[in-house]
């Protein structure tokens, strides 16, 4: 049985968001959402290479449906315990 873990949602895949995630994301699954999937993938790759457990998700903060999809994706991994909106 897979244990669920705390989940951090990070919106805005930039340097400020990544710095906050590096400081606050230890022990959490980090879901990185950005309007450009390439940006989310870049941050996820950097974070994963640094030992974090990170997945990228394409999302648009101006779209309610997109936000709900991001939340649903994050909930697959556990309880959302932190939201960092760095977009």
Features from the language model and the residues they span:
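Canonical Rossmann dinucleotide-binding motif of NAD(H)/NADP(H)-dependent dehydrogenases/reductases
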Residues: 2-31
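Conserved glycine-rich Rossmann-like NAD(P)H-binding loop of the short-chain dehydrogenase/reductase
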Residues: 26-43
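Hydrophobic/aromatic anchor residues within beta-strands of the central parallel beta-sheet
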Residues: 54-56
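Short, conserved SAM-binding/catalytic segment
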Residues: 43-51
């Amino acid at each position: 049985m897979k244990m669920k873990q705390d989940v951090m949602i990070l919106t805005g895949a930039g340097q400020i968001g990544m710095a906050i995630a590096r400081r606050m994301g230890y022990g959490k699954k980090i879901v990185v959402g950005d309007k450009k999937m390439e940006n989310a993938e870049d941050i996820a790759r950097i974070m994963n290479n640094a030992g974090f457990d990170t997945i990228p998700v394409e999302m648009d903060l101006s779209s309610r449906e997109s936000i709900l999809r991001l939340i649903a994706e994050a909930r697959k991994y556990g309880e959302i315990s932190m939201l960092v909106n760095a977009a």
